[in-house]
Amino acid sequence: MLRTILLMSWVGLITTNMVASVKVEKTEYKGWQNCYRVTNGEIELIVTGDVGPRIIRFGFVGGQNMFKEFAEQLGKSGEEKFQLRGGDRVWKAPEDPVATWAPDNVPVQIIPTATGLIARAPIEPLTNLQKEIEIAIAPSGTTVTVSHRITNHSLFTLEFAPWALTMMAQGGIAVSGFPPRGRHPINLEATNPLVMWAYTDLADPRWKFTKKYLTLRQDPNNKEAQKLGLFNPDTWAAYLLNGEAFVKRTKADASKTYPDFGCSFETFTNNEFLEIETLGPLTKLSPGHTVEQVEHWGLYRKVQPTELTDQELDRVLLPLVQATGGAE
């Protein structure tokens, strides 16, 4: 209790000139005794301290969690193998069944900041990488900047990309934008990739394509995995769930090489969750250096497109993408 009071007092002193107070408080969450709640009074995030780094909850205060939670994995720690658990995490890409899936089942260091916190994991024995997530919540409103970082503590230069994965709750629809479209015969050269995996089935009814958008519906009754990737200099995705929308946005650099045949965005689903993922460029990272993937998040109410058409998604979602920020 004393530690919670000190944390809140320290953060409050720094943020006295802000429009609204950013609070960081230690709390119990679904069996974990060492979680941290970051809030500005309107939205809140819960970060695990016993495992991770993970953002296990994001939602309006008192509202639904937009993120997936695996109930049977909550409140636990110390497992030998990687646990999905739910929420938002940082990985290395391309995906490797051993190094990418390194366990994150031990306590993390929590460092309060003026606008949130940093959750920093210890160095992974398997990879000699150290992962951290920093949350910077707006003092008012419903936007957050989330920085996903990986530091190379090995003796060698390693090449990989930072990969920010957000697991969404069941029953929603993901929407992502394609890059600006052109016209034939003016634009004759290929412009951007649409990447398949070996298990991708474009005949699956959960997919829907329009000229400007890719949508994927999460179906709790369909256990078949689906995944696609794409590149967009203005990478963004939205997840629509029960009248609310989660938006994440980042910038991608077309002059750099991205993993998985050039993907800055990927989306995956099965019967348990849907994932929206952004990727940074492949980087040759020297010992002691850090790479990061910065995302801008927004949360919005009363978002209910009447149909998944270009015109309706333009009307409903594009203003929210702009409001989320990250266009610079």
List the predicted regions and their residue ranges.
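Extended, loop-rich substrate-binding clefts of extracytoplasmic carbohydrate-active enzymes
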Residues: S21-K26, K92-T143, L155-F160, G172-I173, ...
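Short, Gly/Pro- and small/polar-rich lid/capping loops
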Residues: V19-C35
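Short Pro-Gly-centered flexible turn/kink motifs
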Residues: G41, I110, T283-R301
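A contiguous, surface-exposed recognition patch within enzymatic or periplasmic domains that forms
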Residues: I43-L45, V51-R57, N65, H153-A161, ...
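Bacterial N-terminal signal peptides
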Residues: I5-T16
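Short beta-strand elements of extracellular/lumenal beta-sandwich folds
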Residues: T143-T151
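Acidic-aromatic substrate-binding/catalytic surfaces of carbohydrate-active enzymes
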Residues: C35-P103, K256
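Terminal connector regions
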Residues: L299-E328
